[in-house]
Amino acid sequence: MENKTKLSDLRPGQQAIIMQFNNNEIFLKLMEMGCLPGEKIVIEQVAPLGDPISVNVLGYSLSLRLNEAEQIIVEIIH
């Protein structure tokens, strides 16, 4: 059973696989950073007010705005 959700719904420490992007602008930005569908992404931190969030992809720490994270569909890894 698939457990797909928006990246913005994950909590620190949760891991997921990037499935798709709902926004081409976000896709191009993240693709330039090496974030592609099929890559593992880990939530590192969430700012106190929920924006931005810090994630780790391919060993790199990236900061994403909440509205960007809402456009990334992931499958949670258990």
Name each model-derived stretch:
Residues 1-10, 78:
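C-terminal regulatory/oligomerization modules of transcriptional regulators
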Residues 2-3, 25-29, 40:
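Short alpha-helix capping/helix-loop boundary micro-motifs
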Residues 13, 50-78:
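C-terminal structural segments of small proteins and small subunits
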Residues 13-26, 37:
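Short, structured beta-strand/loop micro-motifs enriched in basic residues and often containing a Trp
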Residues 18-20, 34, 54-57:
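Short, acidic/hydrophobic/Gly-rich beta-strand patch recurrent on exposed beta strands
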Residues 35-43:
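Conserved beta-strand/loop element in small beta-rich adapter and peptidoglycan-binding domains
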